Swiss-Prot record:
GO biological process: RNA processing; rRNA processing
PANTHER family cross-referenced by the UniProt entry: RNA EXONUCLEASE 4, RNA EXONUCLEASE REXO1 / RECO3 FAMILY MEMBER-RELATED
InterPro entries in alphabetical order: Exonuclease_RNaseT/DNA_pol3 (IPR013520), REX4_DEDDh_dom (IPR037431), REXO1/3/4-like (IPR047021), RNaseH-like_sf (IPR012337), RNaseH_sf (IPR036397)
GO cellular component term of the entry, any: nucleus
Location within or outside the cell: Nucleus
Record's protein name: RNA exonuclease 4
Annotated source species: Yarrowia lipolytica (strain CLIB 122 / E 150)
Family, per entry: Belongs to the REXO4 family.
Key words, A-Z: Exonuclease, Hydrolase, Nuclease, Nucleus, rRNA processing
UniProt key word Nucleus: yes
Purpose of the protein: Exoribonuclease involved in ribosome biosynthesis. Involved in the processing of ITS1, the internal transcribed spacer localized between the 18S and 5.8S rRNAs.
Pfam families associated with the record: RNase_T (PF00929)
GO molecular function: 3'-5' exonuclease activity; exonuclease activity; nucleic acid binding
Length: 291
């Protein structure tokens, strides 16, 4: 009896169900059993063809790792991701980061191509204000066994136009066991007359308040400063997928990103936290859509 009732209900509803299927996009009859398999095969052949095109553009003289990175760039360019602010390679007469950043957004690419000025022009007063965006970079020295742990030795902050808002050496709060001068550029004499850690922390905190923070691998700088910042207000130049693809690694260095994306060389010797902060700001301004 129940089987007959179920059969009767199915028979009475089937015309309505078919009408609903016909009126709904994609609601018609399912494809043939072999359709999914054929579609997968078609997609595989298309991908294989694309890979062959990429391989044809690789240089057999390069190492496997470099060719892998190059293939990623080729595929990225095939997706029409623009390489903004590209400039001529190996040009010894290049403007400084400070001079480039003084330009407005519309003239930024032109500034990258411009010859260096003997004297950098004086910034307008409104370009010297903190503004909405600031870039931060710190230099560390090592403490503890083998200098493995980092503490703050220098902190620099620049605004949207590269103007230095803060650049201070900081007295170490612990005994330094490794000055890391070869990379940090910091010596005992430099920090002897530096400000206290608490003063540096408070000044940075005031500048961060209500602003968007730019920097490279900022988790390290904020940790050493003992500060945090809302994630929504952070633009870390190590994070964009485009930079990772162009550099061919998951955690590209600031030096690597600068060379690959704006063709500028930084950190040729000892680091400068001012230059590194300006470099991060330049990357942000050239590639805003990637953040």
């Amino acid at each position: 009896m129940f089987r007959g009732l179920i059969y009767f209900i199915n028979m009475s509803l089937s015309p309505n169900w078919k009408a609903l299927q016909a009126s709904t996009p994609g609601g018609g009859a399912k494809g043939q059993p072999g359709d999914a398999k054929r579609n997968r095969a078609k997609a595989w052949r298309a991908k294989k063809s694309e890979n062959k095109k990429v391989v044809g553009q690789l240089d057999p003289g390069l190492s496997k790792a470099k060719n892998v990175a190059k293939s990623k760039v080729i595929k990225c360019q095939a997706l029409q991701i623009p390489l903004r602010a590209r400039v001529h390679k190996n040009d010894p007469t290049r403007p400084t980061l400070g001079a480039i950043l003084q330009s407005d957004d519309a003239g930024l690419e032109e500034a990258l191509h411009a010859p260096p000025q003997p004297i950098e022009p004086v910034l307008a007063r409104w370009k010297c204000a903190p503004g909405k965006f600031i870039a931060l970079d710190c230099e560390f020295v090592g403490v503890g066994p083998n200098g493995a742990r980092s503490i703050l030795a220098r902190v620099s902050i620049v605004n949207y136009y590269g103007h230095v808002l803060m650049d201070e050496y900081v007295k170490p709060i612990e005994r330094v066991t490794d000055w890391r001068t070869w990379v940090s550029g910091v010596t005992p004499a430099m920090v002897a007359n530096g400000i206290s850690f608490s003063e540096a922390q408070e000044r940075v905190k005031r500048l961060l308040n209500g602003r968007t923070l730019i920097g490279h691998a900022l988790i390290n700088d904020l940790a050493v400063l003992g500060l945090d910042h809302p994630r929504a207000d952070i633009r870390d130049t190590q994070k964009p997928q485009y930079f990772k693809t162009v550099c061919g690694c998951k955690t590209p260095s600031l030096k690597h990103v600068m060379k690959e994306c704006v063709d500028l060389n930084i950190q040729q010797g000892e680091h400068s936290s001012v230059i590194d902060a300006q470099a991060a700001m330049l990357l942000f301004r050239c590639y805003k859509k990637e953040f």
